[in-house]
Amino acid sequence: MLGVVKSVEVITADITSGLTSVTTSLTKGQNTDNCVPFVTQQNVNATYQPNEWMVDIYFTSTQVVVERTTTGNRIICAVVVVEFDPNRVRVQQKSFSMPLVGGTSTQTVNVGLDYTVDTSRAAMVHHYRQTSGTQSQATDWAVRRNFSGTTQAQFTRRYSDETAQAGHFYVFESLDGAFTTQRIFIEFNSGVGYNTDTISEVDISKSWIVPHSFYSTRTHAEADSNFMFVKFASSTVVEGFRRGTTSYIQVDTFVVEHHDNTVVTHGQFDYASGQQDKQTALPGAVDEDYSAPLATARDGMLYPQVYAGTAYDRYFARIWYSPNTSTIRGYRQSTSDSMQQRWQSIEFAPAPGYYFGGYVTENGSPVVRTVRAYHRETGELLGETTSSGIGGYYYLETTYSGEQYIVCLDDASYPVFNLLAYDLMVPTTISGG
């Protein structure tokens, strides 16, 4: 099966201490309606205030915007913009808000989707900022996401009485089964630092974990009970780790398995005390136009191996390809304390650049026939399909433009084309690209 990703672009958004947002122009002609952003970040200062380090990410028609609420902490974000093929993947881009509401009950907000989703083929990622209040407890800022049925996205946090959160979320859904998804839900009871969730078997070399979301009852800014990572323990088990155990936490995310030529490499950065920069050689060079360097934890959070307090400059690392396309790199600001980070390099199978279709008729009536496309110069078979008995319609995908191929029926072969058979296809329409 052909790929579903049209492009990937990694943007560096440097939000210096005096800025609340950075706007960056995209360079690959993306249709931003079909784009989904992911992020890892490097916190240059030690602040733990969420209104300074938490960022929302959204698009204009040609740009990506990374925005926080207040100035102060410098943040360097690696934003990975994945553009999907709209013929194969439906992207829904919407906003949500968690208003400040008095009381101590758990807050749940449901947002209606524009289209019903097949939850076996859909996943979601969200980005948001703390729009009011300075409360630094994860009970307020940690917002868990999931689908509520097939028509709503659901967002949940423990407390809503001191802060408000708002941002954007992105649903991406395969329309033809090019990828399938499974929900991951892992609970950590108080006193527990490790747990797992079981999934149907996947091919790990074609599967990745959407950066996680979580719900927390930890009423403190210390990161050791909240910051964690998740990873594949096997093809049927996903496991989660945290160091501190002084709270109850729910982790909610998705596994995405591709059924095309997508290749996923998984690994881990071990930041020893005194280490800032980690680089790992990949099995080979990746095509940066179609490759995404991601973490499994939201925002590039690190898993602390020792108690490290509230200095958040050591708890985040951004990830990108550097110094070349054969190397994945993680970089944190502070070198204090030992940390771990799970990474994943996803080299997506490219979506075909061109689509074409037409109708096959004989004596004015639609017929079922094999339709083949060949490269005009080399004779390479670009694809074949069968026309439909309902109208004789056929549809093919190729990476070549219309000027580079010849279409013919099953009684014609390259290099001798049956022009009579070709003429029976009326009309041949070219689209896409």
Feature names for model-found ranges:
Residues 37-43, 53-54, 81, 125-128, ...:
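Extended low-complexity, serine/threonine- and proline-enriched intrinsically disordered segments
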Residues 14-24, 53-67, 99-107, 141-157, ...:
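Ser/Thr- and Asn-enriched, surface-exposed coil loops between beta-strands
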Residues 48-53, 74-77, 136-140, 164-167, ...:
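Short, surface-exposed coil-to-beta transition loops
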Residues 20, 26-31, 50, 96, ...:
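Long luminal/extracellular ectodomains of secretory-pathway precursor proteins
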Residues 5, 48-52, 89-93, 136-139, ...:
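Surface-exposed loop/edge segments in extracytoplasmic proteins
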Residues 1-34, 41-44, 68-121, 127-131, ...:
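Extracellular receptor-binding modules and their adjoining Ser/Thr/Gly/Asp/Asn-rich linkers
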Residues 282, 290, 294, 301-306, ...:
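Extended hydrophobic/Leu-rich segments
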